[in-house]
Amino acid sequence: MATPRAQKFNPIAFTPGPVTLITTIVYLALLIPILVISLVVPPAPETSPEGVNLTEAWRDLQHLTGGFHPYNSRRNDDVHQWLLRRIDSILRPTVEAGERPSANNDIPDVFVFDDNQSNLTYSNGGVGKAAIVGVYFEGTNIIVYIRGTEDDPENWWERSNGKPKGKGGVLVNAHYDSVSTGYGATDNGMGVVSLLQLLKYFTTPGNKPRKGLVLLFNNGEEDYLNGAHVFSQHPLSNFTHTFLNLEGAGAGGRAALFRTTDTEVTRFYQNAKHPFGSVLAADGFKMGLLRSQTDYVVFNGILGLRGLDLAFIAPRSRYHTDQDDARHTSVDSLWHMLSAAIGTTEGLVSYTGTDFDGKSQGLDKVNSGTGTLGVWFDMFGSAFAVFRLHTLFALSVTLLIVAPLVIFITAIVLSKTDRMYLFSMSKSLGGTDERVSLRGLRGLFRTPIILAVATVIPIGLAYLLEKVNPYIVHSSQFSVWSMMISVWIFLAWFLACAADFFRPSALHRAYSYTWIFIATWVMLVINTVYANQKGIAAGYFVFFYFSGSFLATWVSYLELFALPRKGDFARQAIMHSGRPPSSLRSRLLTPSADELPSDTGPHAEYPGDADETDPTESTSLLRGQRTTFANYRTGGTDGVVEGTDEGPSFKHEQSWSWTLPRWTWVLQLLLLAPIVLILVGQLALFLTTSMSQVGSDGVSTFIVYLACAVFTTLLFAPLFPFIHRFTYHIPTFLFLVFVGTLIYNLVAFPFSPANRLKMFFIQEVNLDDGSNTVSLSGIQPYLTDAINSIPSAAGQNITCDQSAFGKLEKCSWAGLPPRVLGQDHDRDTGIVSSDWMSYNITKTVGENKARIEISGRNTRACKLKFDKPVADFQVSGSAVDHRMPHTSGQGVAEIRLWSRTWDRTWVVDICWHDSHDKPEDDDGDDEKQDAPRNGLSGKVICLWSDSNQSDVIPALDELRLYTPNWVAISKSADGLVEASHGITIQ
């Protein structure tokens, strides 16, 4: 047997070696940076930029997070005073410089408002027909106004009903209160110290703003956005037209832009040094998938401002816990937020256009104009793309029409030139009944079947994890990703190789891209409809996905022009088969003796074959002809000529395919894979990172696993057209990875000290019977494990009920008595009602009206709860605002009372309907039916939220001391301790 002729090595040929190497390099070169961006925060500069002092900012953060400082705590007052001192220390050099004879005109006027006057009664709104919650709040906001060069030079706010002249200013907001169980480093200490540095920056000579800048240090955000609501009563709330809200919904990492009002204001975020975020999060709020709100909804929804929400989003396991402290964050995270705030704010205050000074968006809202819906996302944390949703819609509609048309026209041209091998089973010779098999249908349905299987299996694994170990993603997100990716690639490779072994096809790539083109076309249609009808922009990546798939598919069609015409191939195949066409069978196909060379033996050398190797058993018997179409045989009686597919084509693929370009696959890979990995990869990590730990809040984790499965298919579908060319090494390794990660994900404990499970604490004291109940809410069976570790719960009857929050259960037991009344009143002699609160009820004779006076000891938060909603209420001395109605037709079931002073007495006037005037829902609620027919029953409750001193809430101290190290304790409600007294009004 002769030795085959040596072939030159082609580093980009469509053969196993180059395909495996190049695709692996491309995917790793893009996925690794995306992972790094998701996990690593850009380093802070070694030297602070001019006008900023990072060392000072970090010291401020450490001081601010030295204790819990919720609104209802003494330390909150300390933080308030400390902020005033820090603001004064920042401004003092500026004031001294301005008083000198040679004062620099670059130093702006600065006004500080310690707002201890604003208050407001409003409601949080009801859901459906449910009764609403009324709120009375007294604010302690600190407002700093830096006058801009284009601002009204007069102090217009000092005039009665004074209004500013000129263009609107810019508001930057951060709340300085924390939750009662968290130190508030990222929620929202970093926002607060960023405000202090913004004050320092814009009062530095050379940085004077063109537009006025308002820095709002608001208090009371954690208790239903109270501070932002009461800011609406300050004159400066009518001055600002745009805003930047600094928040923390996680506890470190990068600060993400996760919500904006419009395209125009979003463009200013392009000034951020390290932009990070996607419109996906904004649409999550719009569709109701994300329900946790920030001050953004007040500034935009009520005041009509246009702006941005910038917040930390991960890790959620530290959010609202004692690990939200300076120890568990970094200067790098602080700089990431601060640099973004400086860049965005500088752009907003320097803007000279009129986009934000048009007609108001609604009644009694500021004249901030109307923006357009936008699409925005970062790329590698270094660049930021932003454009109008309408632009995306127009481009999508255009591409939906043009792309199929281009493919269709190309297919027609291929057909006209007789090179359309796709969808071709055979080729007939004109004037004969002979047909040559082209095998052009091979691989037609391979792609949808294999991709369906490769997708269904990860979805099945998502169901399996949800049933067996649903919270493993809480601590092992990347183990889940590894499992999904490895099984997808292995299955796709194995099935594609099996199909290629039994039915090899040179059209595998073309068919694969055609199916991907069809699938993404359908996806783009759906996305375009949602963008047009509902303003949803989260599917922006589909446009780019479809664009890449269109170009890659077009390349597959264009490379068919390199093939021989089907008629030429068929004629040569007929001739090489040794069987003449039926119209020529009367003629001998073999040449005459004169035409034969002298040497006609088996080793004869044909003209033009001097460079060929020695003949073998498979060498063609026809001289002077290419061996491409060798060894064809007559297919029996059906008249179809078939071949053994031997020759220059790859392995046993169709013989006509040998002229296909060997390098175009690289072009196709680069047209589709990078854009998919950059956009879809970042979205996938953004989504799973922000949602991987929502299970502790009672949310089903299946949506996270399902997202991993779907995103895996989206990420690796561009690999499928080449995957049958992979060598076995990587898929085999990935199969082992799959086995290992599957076992780990099914049996590993889902929580750890670094990724703790949050449980929610509240202690309720019934002043009527003296009972004291500690409740802990969490997910089972871990909740029971935590309670079993508590000494005071040992031997008690633990009662557990379904919580109102998703999958959480609430378990209760008799707890250690709290000592929240202050040193002069705490005692161990039992619970005495008068020590905790005092109240008085005066009913108006002959009317369904009453006045309730309530005061709590050592607290500034109480509330009233009613068994049936009251029609209206009024708090003595309170302001009201028709933009925020405090009641509605469905009534008010609860009234929350907040005071800036301690031990304050609230005076609340209420009125209610008779039972026959305002029928209750027919839900059989026994508690409601127990209320007097024309009277009212309910509870007066006071709250305590300060746990900075040990032994004040021993039950909470006990939980922190004895629960496993994988448990984090967070607050369940506004108060850590709630004491209640039943009331009845006849």
Curated annotation (Swiss-Prot):
The chain crosses the membrane at residues 21-41, 393-413, 448-468, 478-498, 510-530, 535-555, 666-686, 703-723, 730-750. The active site is at residue 221. Its EC number is 3.4.-.-. Its main location: membrane. Keywords: Glycoprotein, Hydrolase, Membrane, Metal-binding, Metalloprotease, Protease, Transmembrane, Transmembrane helix, Vacuole, Zinc. Zn(2+) 1 binds at residues 175, 187, 247. Residues 1-20, 414-447, 499-509, 556-665, 724-729 are cytoplasmic. It is found in: Vacuole membrane. Glycans are attached at residues 53, 116, 119, 238, 797, 840, 948. May be involved in vacuolar sorting and osmoregulation. This is Vacuolar membrane protease. It comes from Blastomyces gilchristii (strain SLH14081).
